[in-house]
């Protein structure tokens, strides 16, 4: 897949410190219908997550079983943004690694085009 096109976007005070091209992405799981904005390329990207304000860096060693370099994504749900490490599988599916209730889980979806 060649998803890296588009421009930049601002999320106000919820998420800061994020730069790079972006596209829109649609989940195909229990988060069906939510909008996800993807950032990054094959470069390391950093971002500040809303809530605990944890600053983290996504590197090739920090995300398991990936076929493409990991990126950072911002998931926007009802006006609240959260930042998660992500990567693209060879099938073109995007995997979002999320940490909720003390456990990691993955959300998979498909590209939905450039905004």
Regions found by a protein language model. Give the residues of each.
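Extracellular jelly-roll beta-sandwich "head" domains, especially the C-terminal globular C1q domain
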Residues: 16-20, 43-57, 63-115
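Extracellular receptor-binding modules and their adjoining Ser/Thr/Gly/Asp/Asn-rich linkers
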Residues: 1-52, 112
């Amino acid at each position: 897949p060649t998803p890296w096109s588009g421009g930049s976007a601002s999320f106000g005070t919820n998420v800061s410190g994020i730069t790079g091209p972006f596209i829109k992405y649609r989940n195909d799981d229990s988060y069906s219908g939510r909008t996800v904005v993807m950032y990054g390329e094959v470069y390391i990207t950093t971002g500040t997550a809303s809530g605990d304000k944890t600053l983290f860096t996504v590197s090739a060693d920090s995300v398991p079983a990936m076929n493409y370099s990991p990126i950072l994504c911002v998931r926007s749900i009802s006006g609240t943004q959260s930042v998660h490490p992500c990567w693209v599988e060879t099938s073109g599916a995007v995997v979002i690694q999320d940490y909720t209730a003390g456990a990691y889980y993955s959300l998979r979806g498909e590209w939905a085009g450039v905004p």
